[in-house]
A protein has these predicted regions:
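DNA-recognition alpha helix
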Residues: 1
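RNase H-like nuclease fold core
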Residues: 4, 9-13, 19-103
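Conserved protein kinase catalytic core
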Residues: 45, 106, 126
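Conserved beta-strand -> loop -> alpha-helix junction used to position metal-binding or nucleic-acid-contacting
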Residues: 110-140
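A conserved active-site cap/scaffold subdomain adjacent to cofactor or substrate pockets
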Residues: 140-156
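Long, contiguous internal "core" modules enriched in hydrophobic/ aromatic residues
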Residues: 168-169
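Conserved small/polar residues in nucleotide/adenosyl-binding loops
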Residues: 175-180
């Protein structure tokens, strides 16, 4: 029977020898794109040198946009949420970064233009509407924003099955035409 340590060493060796080069190749290809998405979420780590048990760490996600012929999604573990983590990962990238409202993204170099996420904005409108008493919801600005986001998401859902070029053309027609 193999020991747990032996099996663990095998997994680490395979990751280092075989998976790391694949990850690095995908990372290089990701940085060549014009539009990326980024997000980070907490991850509880039971034991980490120099930190208390059950410390909060972060899993960062970076991915290509929906128009990519070959989508790439990469995860990066980091012990902190410092903006330097994103800056280091995105070194060499120049383009649009689609992200939530985390201030760290706005400290990235000028060649990375941060744009907001409609899903996060919609959630904030929804939270604002639900925080109001029901009688104050009708006609409030938060409800107007929520309805706008819902309409926008409806259009995007209709366009989802189209090839990227056709989606772009349809968006140009829909979003630049005057409102009725």
């Amino acid at each position: 029977m193999l020991s747990r340590q032996t099996m663990s060493n095998w997994v680490l060796r395979v990751a280092e020898d075989w998976l790391k080069p694949v990850y690095e190749e995908l990372h290089g290809r990701l940085l060549q794109r014009q539009v990326l998405h980024a997000d980070e979420t907490t991850l509880q780590v039971l034991k980490l040198e120099g930190r208390t048990a059950r410390s909060k760490c972060y899993m960062w996600l970076y991915r290509t946009s929906g128009d990519a012929e070959h989508p790439i999604v990469l995860y990066e573990y980091q012990p902190t949420r410092k903006a330097e983590n994103a800056a280091a990962f995105l070194e060499g990238f120049s383009g649009w970064l689609h992200a939530d409202g985390y201030a760290g993204y706005h400290r990235l170099p000028e060649n990375i233009r941060v744009v907001g996420c409609w899903a996060h904005l919609r959630r904030k409108f929804d939270e604002a509407v639900n925080a109001l008493p029901k009688e104050q919801r009708v006609g409030c600005a938060a409800l107007e924003g929520l309805e706008y986001c819902n309409a926008l998401f409806g259009i995007e859902q209709e366009l989802a099955g189209l090839p990227p070029e056709e989606r772009y053309e349809q968006r140009c027609l829909l979003y630049t035409s005057p409102s009725p």
